[in-house]
């Protein structure tokens, strides 16, 4: 199965988001999988999530770290070497870098070159996770770029048989990382 869960909900009201977060947190706890929340620092604190992931247009990494403390996971989205180095300096535990391929789950992103991805991965000492447009057909193209892992949405949730999709993806991932 999966090794890390990030709850990313852009269209839910606060109460529905809270209920969903509690439900997913309990499921993650049952399977010993870290659970983080995207963008919503207050909700992450309220449900005692394992961490938070923020983008470049959200709260600054150092401010998030000050709120969540040293023991929670902090992930930061980056698209340049400069952003990556700053996020690491400000307390990020890992980076989400991309989009590495065209994606339908985020409207305002551009696709990074694989050379730039390699540069970002080489510039920092914390884990770097590839994000954006990754699927069974293109995952092998990430080999050798320096990523520590991948982040998936539609490659899992857009499939008719989610369990089968996860197993096939996990097999491919094991060849790369």
Feature locations, PLM:
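Long, low-complexity, intrinsically disordered polar/charged segments
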Residues: 1-14, 88, 92-99, 121, ...
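N-terminal active-site wall of soluble small-molecule enzyme domains
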Residues: 4-70
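A cross-domain feature marking catalytic cores of carbohydrate-active enzymes
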Residues: 7-9, 37-41, 56, 78, ...
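Structural motif corresponding to alpha-helix initiation and N-cap regions
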Residues: 14, 38, 58-61, 80-81, ...
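Catalytic cores of alpha/beta
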Residues: 35-50, 64, 79-91, 123-130, ...
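Glycine/Thr-rich beta-alpha phosphate-binding loop at enzyme active sites
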Residues: 47-49, 54, 73-122, 161, ...
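Glycine-rich phosphate-binding active-site loops on the catalytic face of alpha/beta enzymes
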Residues: 56-64, 96-108, 136-172
